[in-house]
Design a protein with these regions (language model features):
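Conserved AAA+ ATPase small/helical "lid" subdomain
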Residues: 341, 345-462, 751
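P-loop NTPase Walker
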Residues: 2-16, 20, 24, 28-33, ...
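Conserved helicase NTPase catalytic core signature
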Residues: 376-380, 385, 395-397, 430-634, ...
């Protein structure tokens, strides 16, 4: 804490006689010096780009044919050169952003991250008269650049040698005398801001006094206008943040911190740092999980700006499952049910119940079956001849069954005198196979409904995924038919019996009728199909008995109706977690790999024999593995406090063997049962050892806004301390009351007012149910203003914010006060609170929830 206080204090002016006090000549001279260095860096970058282009062209010119080994070597060289060229060609804003001026150091001392780097000054570095000479100057940038003699022109910000740029404070300066942040755009240096780490020294550089420009880099960075995308903080990382970014990756790193402490930025910079430190170890990919698509869009440009892209996947929780994208919103009561760990038991029953439904009806009393069959036949007005298999016909036109569920035929008939009950599927009348009839060894063999039901129950008695049990079901069907054939007793010789059995199995399983029966009796279920089946309240009631109450069951079934009978309707973020669980419970049968198609012309001409088969290139393999990847080497969870128990299970599957970084703040949690979520988180993380960090300084909000938000925090979580704001602007939050009931005009007027007062963005935060309304209120005000729901504001920041009706936001859910706390902490400069009668504002417009 002392070091952090010192870092904050260092943002103000240091005592130094050579500090620039407004003389442009000193500032211009320093900017010119940095410009010369930047020009040298870009000249070297151009040389490296030409080298990479030459390597690519040279490799490409090495014939298109050759041995598989030679072709693989060529592909690997092109792949590596292409990656290098892509990194070099990126025109990063602020490519070179920092510099540190260092005293002579002690040799051979282990420094940050285990590297042998001089971190402490030599004993004779500071003379008795408190003067010293600068021995070394390092420039810090997004990627490292060496000159032709392999001397560093730019140090990669992730390198151990760059650590003092972030960790040095006046209390613990190490070798650093001056830390400089360089602001540039493209190839032009715009300005410099210095922090003096040893103000008591008189330091010299090249025989001249060391100049210090500006009033501190941190304050300059905090005062910049915001856009709708997140900028990296690589030039303004503070000491406590740097400790997290460079923490060893073994096991689990947990990071807590209130609003504005830089948790999201730290998580993204940590991903870039880990790849730099051990790229081979993290070749399996790094997954960054964000709570909302808005936050993904806001942050996705950070990693490319840090020189990393390709091996890091940033995904919203609602898009973690292939082919699924959350676009719908669940009401809080429904979300509490879907996110609860209780849903695991419901889904387990649904996965099996979706398959067992057919046998339940098939085993009904014979009289009931007869009556139902006659009624169905009467309705159809026709009879159908029985084939080898007794099972229903396709559903009538207009009746649709859920994909992956049992077919829903409208009628079925058997041989004369035999009754078959049509099975009523969820979306209409229907039937499932109730009798298997085959001809083998000259005999007609039959398995009746009760026998089929017993076989199904026997197979489902295990715990394996339902779709993976199908081979066992097939085996038991064949066993039952073999037993009925009487062929087992024909021979006493076991070898002859085994040969006869093999022939029997081959004959039966090659028949289209048996294949068709198995496809219908034990179909491959799909997660969407089972989820759609759960929209039937009666069926869901059976599967959720003693797990959910009637009200919860009714609300859950009603919310799932939006999926439609085909299961292809819109999903919520909570539905996606249920789909992922069902994928595990159902399983996916192995699919045969698609064989390479052969060109008949190659065979005729003999080229097929002469040409080596082309192996998959390294680039193609990398792209394929990235697309197929479901597990990662490292998982970073942002805003972890918002994950539900079911979402923790989904994320946990993607990091079974991974190391983890978990970032969150309990005070901002929107989940109503934190204890249940904590239990699910512990299960996902397993028994791995944990290292914990806490970020304590609020770099986003001015003190005036932070103090107002702290009042809500005291109501939401008594005893919880809010982070300490690093600055004050003197601008108090504004309170506005809706007049004459015109909420839309009041909000629009306040948004317009803020647009005139800030250079960057304005966010208007409303209750989730008002999102579409709010967007209409702001129509025509321009791109700098955006409307968002209270749950969508997490992790975002704006120059100014309008929070509409605190009471309405707080009443949305049991976690409403915590959600309101988040909404109040989005602004970097100005905050306006709009109150309605529901907020009970006092004469000054302050709503009840925000009063002392």
């Amino acid at each position: 804490m002392a070091a952090q206080d010192a870092a904050v204090q260092s943002a103000g002016p240091a005592v130094d006689p050579v500090r620039d006090t407004g003389h442009d000549s000193v500032r211009d001279r320093e900017i010119d010096g940095e410009q010369r260095h930047l020009d040298q860096v870009y000249r070297r970058l151009e040389e490296k780009i030409h080298e990479a282009e030459f390597l690519m062209h040279d490799a490409a010119k090495r014939g298109q044919v050759g041995t598989p080994g030679a072709l693989a070597e060529r592909d690997a060289q092109v792949f590596r050169a292409g990656i290098h060229l892509n990194r070099l060609n990126n025109e990063f804003e602020d490519f070179l952003f920092g510099r540190i001026d260092l005293l002579p150091g002690k040799d051979g001392q282990k420094g940050p991250d285990g590297a042998y780097t001089s971190v402490e000054p030599a004993d004779d570095a500071i003379r008795s008269d408190r003067t010293a000479d600068i021995a070394e100057t390092l420039h810090i940038g997004r990627i490292g650049v060496l000159d032709s003699d392999y001397s560093p022109l730019v140090i990669d910000w992730r390198a151990p040698a760059a650590a003092p740029f972030y960790r040095s404070t006046p209390v613990d300066p190490g070798r650093v005398v001056r830390r400089r942040v360089i602001r540039s755009k493209g190839r032009r240096v715009l300005g410099v801001e210095d922090d003096l780490m040893r103000p008591e020294l008189t330091a010299s550089l090249g025989g001249a006094a060391l100049p210090v420009i500006g009033d501190g880099a941190l304050m300059a960075a905090l005062g910049q206008a915001r856009s709708h995308t997140m900028r990296d903080i690589v030039s303004s990382i503070q000491a406590e943040q740097d400790l997290v970014i460079r923490a060893p990756a073994a096991s689990v790193t947990e990071v807590s911190g209130g609003p504005g402490t830089g948790k999201t930025a730290v998580a993204l910079h940590r991903a870039a740092y880990l790849l730099y430190q051990d790229r081979r170890r993290y070749a399996g990919g790094i997954l960054v999980v964000s709570p909302t698509p808005l936050l993904v869009a806001y942050t996705e440009g950070v990693l490319p700006s840090l020189g990393e892209e390709g091996q890091v996947a940033i995904r919203a929780v609602g898009s973690l499952v292939d082919g699924a994208e959350a676009t719908a919103y669940d009401e809080p009561a429904v979300a509490r049910v879907k996110g609860s760990a209780r849903m695991l038991k419901v889904l387990r029953k649904a996965a099996r119940g979706a398959l067992e439904g057919a046998s339940a009806t098939a085993s009904a009393p014979r009289g009931a079956r007869t009556a139902a069959t006659r009624a169905a036949r009467s309705a159809r007005g026709a009879e159908v001849q029985a084939g080898q298999l007794a099972f229903g016909e396709p559903a009538e036109s207009g009746e649709v069954t859920a994909p992956g569920m049992l077919p829903a035929p409208a009628d079925a008939s058997s041989a004369p005198g035999e009754d078959v009950l049509p099975y009523a599927a969820r979306s209409g009348r229907g039937g499932a196979p109730v009798r298997l009839r085959v001809v083998a060894f000259g005999r007609r063999l039959e398995l009746e409904a009760d026998e089929l039901r017993r076989i199904r129950e026997s197979v489902l008695g295990g715990t394996a995924p339902v779709n993976l049990l199908r081979p066992r079901a097939r085996r038991l069907l064949l066993d039952a038919l073999w037993s009925k054939s009487g062929a087992a007793g024909r021979h006493t010789d076991p070898e002859l019996t085994a040969e006869l059995r093999s022939s029997f199995d081959e004959d039966v399983t090659s028949e289209d009728s048996f294949i068709e029966f198995l496809e219908t009796w034990w179909p491959e279920l799909t997660p969407r199909g089972v989820l759609a089946a759960m929209a039937d309240e009666r069926r869901l009631g059976r599967w959720s008995r003693r797990i959910l109450n009637q009200g919860e069951t009714r609300r859950l079934a009603r919310s799932l109706k939006r999926l439609g009978a085909d299961g292809k309707g819109p999903l919520s973020v909570h539905d996606v977690a249920l789909l992922d669980e069902l994928e595990t419970l159902l399983g996916t049968p192995a699919r045969p790999r698609k064989r390479r198609e052969l060109d008949p012309l190659d065979q005729l001409t003999g080229l097929e024999e002469l040409m080596p088969q082309r192996e998959e290139s390294q680039r193609e393999r990398a792209e394929r593995l990235a697309a197929e990847r479901t597990e990662y080497a490292h998982v970073i969870v942002d805003e972890a406090q918002d994950l539900t128990p079911m979402q923790w299970r989904m994320v946990g599957r993607r990091g079974r063997h991974a190391t983890w970084t978990v970032v969150g703040d309990a005070a901002q949690s929107s989940w109503s049962d934190p204890d249940e979520a904590a239990e699910a988180r512990d299960e996902a993380l397993g028994t791995r050892p944990r290292r914990r960090f806490t970020l304590t300084v609020n770099y986003r909000n001015p003190a005036e806004i932070a103090e107002l938000a702290a009042r809500v925090l005291a109501l939401a979580m008594p005893g919880m301390e809010s982070p300490r704001a690093v600055r004050s602007t003197g601008v108090e939050p504004r309170f506005s009351v809706v007049r004459d009931g015109d909420l839309a005009e009041t909000v629009r007027a306040e948004a317009r007012r803020l647009l005139d007062r800030v250079d960057g963005t304005v966010g208007v935060v409303v209750a989730m149910g008002r999102r579409e309304q709010a967007a209409r209120w702001l129509a025509g005000l321009g791109e700098r203003v955006v409307a968002l729901g209270s749950l969508e504001a997490k992790g975002l920041e704006y120059d100014a914010t309008v929070v509409v009706s605190p009471a309405e936001i707080a009443d949305e859910s049991p976690a409403g006060l915590r959600v309101l706390y988040v909404a109040l902490t989005r602004a970097t400069q100005q905050l306006t609170v709009v109150s309605t009668a529901r907020d009970e504002p006092d004469p000054e417009g302050v709503p009840d929830l925000l009063r002392d």
